[in-house]
Amino acid sequence: MSTATKPSALAFDLQARCSTSKARASTLHLPHGPVDLPMFMPVATQASLKGLTPEQLEETGCRLCLNNTYHLGLKPGQAVLDAIGGAHKLQGWNYNILTDSGGFQMVSLLKLAKITEEGVRFLSPHDGSPMLLTPEHSMSLQNSIGSDIMMQLDDVIQTTSPDHARMKEAMERSVRWLDRCIAAHKYPEKQNLFCIIQGGLDLEMRKQCCLEMIKRDTPGIAIGGLSGGEAKSDFCKVVDTCTDLLPENKPRYIMGIGYPEDIVVAVALGADMFDCVWPTRTARFGNAITSQGVLNLKHARYARDFGPVEHDCTCTCCRSKEDGGLGITRAYIYHLAAKETVGAHLLTMHNVHHLLSLMRRARQAILEDRYPEFAQDFFARYFADKATPQWAIDALQGVGIEL
């Protein structure tokens, strides 16, 4: 085990704590600029956010996005990344990048992937040849990508798996693989390696993993293995259990969540960072995320609705032309949705802006010590025409917020 503190390319400035819940406001200082937390990271899988240029992504206020190590390792490949000088230059992005380790994609996307102590064995999707992703190779790829935050290779299995022995093996292997990642990481003074807490829905296993990961003193800590079909009540218990144990002076990242209600609850439970493909993916199906819930603008009821996608939204899509925006209407999105990709692009612009705006408002509420009121107002609006989920009521009640 490597316990010595290594150089870090990260500074974490904790600025406020909610006096009722566990919500926190902070600033993360990274090599490509500061990032205010809590925050949502859009997912630019292949060094591109589907439907947005880097300039349009910048306009949403995004200062940290996610790239996928597995996909970039396949194409353009490590040699091209080394030649151009990393993913920032490849995609023309001047701000921060977080990369996942690539392991999750191999296990979830590829047939016949097999995990051993050595690494993840799989067949190349290009020519079917056998390949191996080890912790060392994952670090090498992420060093070539040049991401500001890089994730350890971990052993990921479905949270709902009934195989307790396999879950324990995955948790313990993730700790061992972290040690290998730390040893293989070439540029700790330029890139920040985050550990990933595993353990399924077993709270004792999660506690054990937290304690082991904390000993390794990585610049930040992720809670992984969630959003895998588990009940939301179980998800909340895992997050609550982990954040109780995690150090106050490090950022906390929950991997793979993007529904607004999940994020508002997770912030109350003490988490800082989130990512998910859902806001961009759902845009491609004609869905707009709004403060009143998700609107499917492919529905005929919007054919003569000449209002903006969301009233009072300040994104480029929704702002009037007089205010420097595009002045796009719901009727126009309805007209485009079935035939033209530009409709998906416009909704992507809106949805990403909406999530980032939600995070900015959450942060401001924490700074002003009114996060309980913020959460109450969010749920009253978002679920105005339907019942608030019981899991959210229970989770927030557990940290002193009554809905």
Label each residue range with its predicted role.
Residues R63, D148, P219, D272, ...:
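Short acidic/polar active-site loop segments enriched in Thr and Asp
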Residues S138, A170, S174-W177, C181, ...:
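Alpha-helical packing segments of well-folded alpha/beta enzyme cores
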Residues M1-Y187, L295, A300-A303:
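Non-catalytic, usually N-terminal nucleic-acid engagement modules in DNA/RNA processing proteins
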Residues S2-T3, E172-V175, A184, P188-E310:
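Glycine-rich phosphate/ribose-binding loops and adjacent secondary-structure elements
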Residues G146, L178, I182-H185, D217, ...:
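Structural signal for hydrophobic packing residues in well-ordered secondary-structure cores
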Residues G33, C65, D100, Q142, ...:
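Conserved, mostly hydrophobic/aromatic
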